[in-house]
From Swiss-Prot:
The lineage of its organism: Eukaryota, Viridiplantae, Streptophyta, Embryophyta, Tracheophyta. Zn(2+) binds at D193, H195, D281. The keyword Repressor applies. Residues 24-338 are annotated as: Histone deacetylase. This is Histone deacetylase 2. It is an enzyme of class 3 (hydrolase). The gene is HDAC2. Responsible for the deacetylation of lysine residues on the N-terminal part of the core histones (H2A, H2B, H3 and H4). Histone deacetylation gives a tag for epigenetic repression and plays an important role in transcriptional regulation, cell cycle progression and developmental events. Histone deacetylases act via the formation of large multiprotein complexes. It comes from Oryza sativa subsp. japonica. Induction: Induced by drought and salt stresses.
Amino acid sequence: MDPSSAGAGGNSLASASCGDAQKRRVCYFYDPEVGNYYYGQGHPMKPHRVRMTHALLAHYGLLAPAKMQVLRPLPARDRDLCRFHSDDYVAFLRAVTPETQFDQIRSLRRFNVGEDCPVFDGLYAYCQTYAGASVGAAVKLNHGTHDIAINWSGGLHHAKKSEASGFCYVNDIVLAILELLKLHERVLYIDIDIHHGDGVEEAFYTTNRVMTVSFHKFGDYFPGTGDIRDIGYSEGKYYCLNVPLDDGIDDDSYQSIFKPIISKVMEMYRPGAVVLQCGADSLSGDRLGCFNLSGKGHAECVKFMRSFNVPLLLLGGGGYTIRNVARCWCYETGVALGEELREKLPYNEYYEYFGPEYSLYVAASNMENRNTNKQLEEIKCNILDNLSKLQHAPSVQFEERIPETKLPEPDEDQDDPDERHDPDSDMLLDDHKPMGHSARSLIHNIGVKREITETETKDQHGKRLTTEHKVPEPMADDLGSSKQVPTADANSMAINAPGNAKNEPGSSL
């Protein structure tokens, strides 16, 4: 991609000339250690699902160098995480351990670390891994060497500047978007997780350089935000779109609202790059979800965004029925590559997880769809009306300060910092999910219908925030209007070759 055209946003409309079979240059970030992290017994968040996804990719032959570049990410450093997160929060994550946590009760409460977001062995390394992968993927796109970058371990959209939330500790999405803003005047963020992408929305609520669009379950459901009336604030007014949905939405209903809205967004906003959070808890049968999307229906969103031929970052997110998550992200990797994968799963290390059907496809169920055509049409018209109030993208003046995203200064005893941001790195973070019906906690609602009190629904996490209340801490103080094209060299470790993956399941195939 020619940097001189970065602000133009590429194609604004899906192109018939960019057929699904047309090849894209794809890079995929993966750290063999990511599947070893463990949130604890009974916790629904399982990083192991990323390892299962990787095994499927290996046995389908998608890790071959001829298919895509496979990269091992470099870990994000403190200074990298502090481009968005507060210094004291990052210092806490770095220092806390399962053994010392009970000596830091006040800090645990202050940073919302505990039940949903527990302290576990290797917590900080886990955050460094998935955040480093997402930032590295963004750098790869900025360099123009790849059209699509993938990090299935990322997509942790609930984390705030100084607070963990919904299984998320570090917001790798915000960090990746800040990296993309070095080159692109406008970045579009789309979230198809069943939970509202509150952390990303809050970070960019007052700027027009990032548009956020979230399709999510709304109501008495974690995190309790994402009202259609929340549209952004100040310079960011109308650059935040929320699409509230009800239980049981199926493929046809979902696409009837996703495609018209996103088509109009692409036409009006003309982003230079797109970040698509592919949370798999919107699939039918998810442990914590209540939607009824099939694997193909979920992947249709990826296919549609691919058709615009704009630099695309694919991230993971929620997903708690792990056999479905692995199949979904494997299938969507095939979509990114323009590869048709056979339905019958190849034999692999986790084959028994996928019985009795042993099919790549996640099927929808016969659950009731509570989204009527009338309701969906009203939502669509409301969103399109808000889009009509936007200035046309080419004439937008970006005068507010944008988050500072300069490459970190080198340490005398460290490797070249440019290498730390190389798109060749590959680690992803993936987390967040509401459970049950509480707008405050995901964990409390697994198998338990918990009554929500009036107080709970009106606190920081549970209330329906309107534009009058929702003026988040702007990413703000570090915002600057100048763009900087990253100069990092591609020095992350490529791990296409089977022997380089540290005996990771599937990597030797």
